[in-house]
Amino acid sequence: MSNLNKFRELRKEDNIDFYIIPSSDFHQSEYVSEYFKGREFISGFTGSVGTLLISQNQAYLWADGRYFIQAERELEGSGIELMKMATEGYPTLNEWLANNCKENSKVAFDGRVLSTVLYKEILEIAKENNFSIELNIDLLEICWIDRPSLPKEPIFIHETIFSGKS
């Protein structure tokens, strides 16, 4: 059974209609540690940027122009449809949610890795379309059995020559 299908089985038990997996970590970094590569684990897409939306019967990956060719190759045969960001004929994630989330649908995600801006946008769409949001669900914890640990390297201060002043 594919990781996507395992994930769908878990989601069904929680009555979640749509689950969003972004590419970021707790700090909204573009390049993340292995622990935060849930989108890659489920979809097989290895690009640094992309957002995965999973429903019981469909799955979509939003990727930008840097990754169109790579995503097409890596998603082939997965059942995940590529949504080409900033390309005519492809809705944004928010447009897709507004057009496809029916009244009383449930959209879930791990709120620790979603940007505040995207959360507020989805919240507004949810209010307009009368669907609910569950932001404290990390289904990856359950389905990714051998998930790498969170990084434990010590933090350090970069010298001003590298970090600049603000």
Per-region residue spans from a language model:
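Acidic beta-strand-to-loop metal/phosphate-binding motif
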Residues: 105-112
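N-terminal accessory/capping or targeting/presequence segment of soluble
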Residues: 1-102, 114-166
